[in-house]
Amino acid sequence: MTEDEAAVAALTEEARILFAGRIEFLKSAPALKFLPDPDVPEIAFAGRSNVGKSSLLNALTGRKSIARASVTPGRTQELNFFEVGEPTRLRLVDMPGYGFAKAPIKVAENWRRLVRDFLRGRVVLKRTLLLIDARHGMKPVDDEMMKMLDEAAVGYRVVLTKADKIKAEELAEVLARTQADARKHIAAHPQVLATSAETKLGIAELRAAVLADAGI
């Protein structure tokens, strides 16, 4: 085992232990004034409605219902905070889904304002994970979200969800296209991760990435 491989293995094991420990819902914030104190690093999760964000959060934390999927896409317009570790070492932030066709214009405007202000003003936000459905690839609304992240100067990783739903050769093509798209954005991390909440593909790697991005 090389030195780099040993470091990756150690980080992966540290992340496994951390996520096997205390993980608790802290609060929901419908506006910035309700945000928790900025005292620990935060990693945010963003993605289109029905991208599988709740399922991925549940798989990441090893819990069945730490994050509940909304019945109506676009219904949840709050930032949901989860504490990880005892004492708390980092927070996961479940951001409201975007691209919801059924949502009223006012709801969409409120979403943009809440998310934009959070991204621009949250000093402890270390990374945003942008979730993309592997079956569909990047959509125009995803590109809009990436531009918002670029403008806010928030570093982000692209994470493919539901990778088990397509064939291996299709996944390789989607990964290549997505990485090419990510390279066009100044704030995007060059590595794109492929995951599956069902088969747990990429979950250990995602935990390690979260730990590394949090800088703890």
What are these regions (language model features)?
Residues 56, 128-129, 206:
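Hydrophobic packing within well-folded, soluble alpha/beta domains
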Residues 33-40, 75-81, 96-126, 134-148:
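Switch II of P-loop NTPase G domains
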Residues 20-32, 165-216:
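Canonical P-loop GTPase G-domain recognition
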Residues 82, 161, 206:
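Residue-level signal for inorganic ion chemistry
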Residues 75, 90, 97-99, 135-138, ...:
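Conserved nucleotide-binding/hydrolysis micro-motifs of P-loop NTPases
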Residues 1-102, 215-216:
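Conserved G1/Walker A P-loop phosphate-binding module
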Residues 60-64, 119, 210:
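Hydrophobic aliphatic residues
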Residues 113-190:
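Conserved C-terminal guanine-recognition region of P-loop GTPase G domains, centered on the G4
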